[in-house]
């Protein structure tokens, strides 16, 4: 009997694969436990339609991420920070500050976890920060840190 795996099954295959299995194993274990569906033409057509939807959605997400990357590469973010007597910042610029400033100045929302500050920003100047946008797409954001 042919089954369409709904979930990953150890030693058999991954979700979405079609496998030929013994009737008893397919009916009693795989279908009985909700790990697979009987691979009828109806089920296979629905599965293909879902796969097309997922592929289309992923293409749209990639296009949006690329568009956002272009926007961020051309953006220069300005962050005002308190400065001490010696010209160094009081504290340092954090991922959260960068994320909040992006949202306030450009209405771009990026999670602070996706902003990679290699070294802490502790002095006034212009810095480049890597932003992870998903689907292996990255953008370089320029940050201008100025005195408050």
Curated annotation (Swiss-Prot):
**Gene3D superfamilies linked to this entry:** Ribosomal protein L9, C-terminal domain, Ribosomal protein L9, N-terminal domain
Q: Which residues form a coiled coil?
A: none
What's one GO MF term for it? rRNA binding
Q: Does the keyword Hydrolase apply?
A: no
GO CC annotation: ribonucleoprotein complex; ribosome
Q: Cite a single GO BP annotation.
A: translation
Keyword Ribosomal protein in record: yes
Q: Which UniProt keywords apply?
A: Ribonucleoprotein, Ribosomal protein, RNA-binding, rRNA-binding
Q: What's the short name of a Pfam family annotated to this entry? A: Ribosomal_L9_C
Query: What InterPro entries does the database record attribute to this sequence?
Result: Ribosomal_bL9, Ribosomal_bL9/RNase_H1_N, Ribosomal_bL9_bac/chp, Ribosomal_bL9_C, Ribosomal_bL9_C_sf, Ribosomal_bL9_N, Ribosomal_bL9_N_sf
The record describes the protein's role as: Binds to the 23S rRNA.
Q: Which family does it belong to?
A: Belongs to the bacterial ribosomal protein bL9 family.
Supply the NCBIfam families for this chain.
L9
Q: What is this protein called?
A: Large ribosomal subunit protein bL9
Which species?
Answer: Aliarcobacter butzleri (strain RM4018)
């Amino acid at each position: 009997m042919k089954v369409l795996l709904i979930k990953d099954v150890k030693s058999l295959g991954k979700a979405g694969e079609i496998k030929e299995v013994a009737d008893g194993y397919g009916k009693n274990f795989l279908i009985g436990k909700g790990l697979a569906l009987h691979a009828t033409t109806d089920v296979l057509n629905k599965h293909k339609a879902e796969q097309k939807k997922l592929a289309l959605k992923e293409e749209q997400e990639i296009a949006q991420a690329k568009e956002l990357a272009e926007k961020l590469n051309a953006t220069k973010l300005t962050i005002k920070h308190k400065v001490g007597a010696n010209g160094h910042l009081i504290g340092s610029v954090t991922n959260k500050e960068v994320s909040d400033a992006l949202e306030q100045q450009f209405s771009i929302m990026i999670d602070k976890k996706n902003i990679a500050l290699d070294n802490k920003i502790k002095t006034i100047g212009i810095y480049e920060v890597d932003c992870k946008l998903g689907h292996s797409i990255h953008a370089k954001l320029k940050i201008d840190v100025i005195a408050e």
